[in-house]
């Protein structure tokens, strides 16, 4: 038997083993149920959408709309956080909510007291200004003022004092109002996170949005 016959016989018995590049069959991909990574990817996609809504411009927005955007941000944060961190933030948020609501009630009482102070100071300032104005247009009142110099000084001093109190109380009231708005936004954010952290999600957005608590709702 010559060399060519031997080579042909060897190739027939060994099949593809004599090929320069061995043949490898393609892998078969079987359909499988959604994995945890797929679910995480879905949650991240929803989180990005919510975060995009929360990061939109707030120029000219009212306080309620700003609170809503803060709630959107809390929802996006909830979807990004893993389960252990989510539960920790939930428990801390529940405790913080109690303190925030107490602070909010205290600030509202302070603002009410300042409103009363502003009202009284405004009335006294207006009255003393009217008395001072009458002394200019009425000679008899002006003569009485000249006879009772201490009364004129007392009226002017009271007018100056009430005007100062009026301006100071107004500035303090504005600062307290800013703190109230910020505290209400923090409460809305934490309530939204706690409400969302108490829910489970199976991939259905409608189920995710049911029962979410926002603000005082």
From Swiss-Prot:
Q: Which InterPro entries match?
A: Orbi_NS3
Function text? May play a role in the release of virions from infected cells.
Tell me which family the UniProt entry assigns to this protein.
Belongs to the orbivirus NS3 family.
Give the protein's recorded name: Non-structural protein NS3
Q: Which organism is it from?
A: African horse sickness virus 4
């Amino acid at each position: 038997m010559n060399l060519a016959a031997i080579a042909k016989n060897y190739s027939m018995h060994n099949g593809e083993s004599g090929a320069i590049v061995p043949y490898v069959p393609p892998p078969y991909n079987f359909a499988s149920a959604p994995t945890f990574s797929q679910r995480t990817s879905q949650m991240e996609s929803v989180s990005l959408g919510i975060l995009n809504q929360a990061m939109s411009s707030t120029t000219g927005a009212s306080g309620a709309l700003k609170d809503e955007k803060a709630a959107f941000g809390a929802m996006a944060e909830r979807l990004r956080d893993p389960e252990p961190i989510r539960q920790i933030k939930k428990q801390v948020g529940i405790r913080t909510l109690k303190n925030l609501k107490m602070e909010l009630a205290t600030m509202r009482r302070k603002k009410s007291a300042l409103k009363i102070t502003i009202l009284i100071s405004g009335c006294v300032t207006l009255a003393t200004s009217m008395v001072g104005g009458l002394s200019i247009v009425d000679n008899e009142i002006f003569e009485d003022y000249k006879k009772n110099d201490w009364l004129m000084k007392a009226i002017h001093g009271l007018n100056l004092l009430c005007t100062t109190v009026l301006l100071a109380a107004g500035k303090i009231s504005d600062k307290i109002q800013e703190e109230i708005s910020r505290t209400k936004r923090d409460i809305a954010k934490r309530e939204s996170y706690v409400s969302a952290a108490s829910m489970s999600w199976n991939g259905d957005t409608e189920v995710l949005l049911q029962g979410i608590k926002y603000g005082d709702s």
